[in-house]
Swiss-Prot record:
GO terms for cellular component: cytosolic ribosome; cytosolic small ribosomal subunit; nucleus. Belongs to the eukaryotic ribosomal protein eS10 family. The lineage of its organism: Eukaryota, Metazoa, Ecdysozoa, Arthropoda, Hexapoda. This is Small ribosomal subunit protein eS10B. Keywords: Cytoplasm, Ribonucleoprotein, Ribosomal protein. It comes from the Eukaryota. GO terms for molecular function: RNA binding; structural constituent of ribosome. It comes from Drosophila melanogaster. One of its GO terms (biological process) is cytoplasmic translation. The keyword Protease does not apply.
Length: 160
């Protein structure tokens, strides 16, 4: 497809600067959202050309194209745009880590300081005592020891 060289160079510069470019699958859009002076069709066709040469990887989801530069694409665009090797796409740059100090949680256990009022005594009230309930669990074990109770579980309502 014929397109002005200025459009192609602007698309390649943006792609090299960002490392990725996104375009909606709308061939009739008057302009691309990031590149206001360039039609969306020119962006799609330029990226399809790079994809056919193996310089970008293409993903398509939800009516949007996503193109990512490959290592070969970085070298090719660097030579096409006459850029020095020190300049790299922003996807390859490591984010600057700020040395911010995170507040440490207060010592009070894994649940935080709000649960410090709950002690083992509060929790022990919910636990069963080893012999305090009056039920002999060991004596009820065996065939025929338990009572069989039939209750209706299926059907249309309860019949008494």
């Amino acid at each position: 497809m014929f397109m002005p060289k200025a459009h192609r160079v602007a698309i390649y510069e943006y792609l090299f600067k960002e490392g990725v470019i996104v375009a909606k699958k709308d061939f009739h859009a008057q302009k691309h959202p990031e590149l206001e002076s360039i039609p969306n069709l020119h962006v799609i066709k330029a990226m399809q050309s790079l994809h056919s040469r193996g310089l970008v990887k293409e993903q398509f989801a939800w009516r949007h194209y996503y193109w990512y530069l490959t290592n070969e694409g970085i070298e090719e665009l660097r030579s096409y745009l006459h850029l020095p090797p020190e300049i790299v796409p922003s996807t390859l740059k490591r984010p600057a880590r700020s040395e911010t100090v995170r507040p440490r949680p207060a010592v009070g256990g894994p649940r935080g300081p709000g649960d410090a009022s709950k002690t083992g005594e509060d929790r022990s009230a919910y636990r069963r005592a080893p012999g305090g309930s009056g039920v002999d669990k060991k004596g009820d074990v065996g065939p025929g020891a338990g009572e069989v109770e039939f209750r209706g579980g299926f059907g249309r309502g309860s019949r008494n």
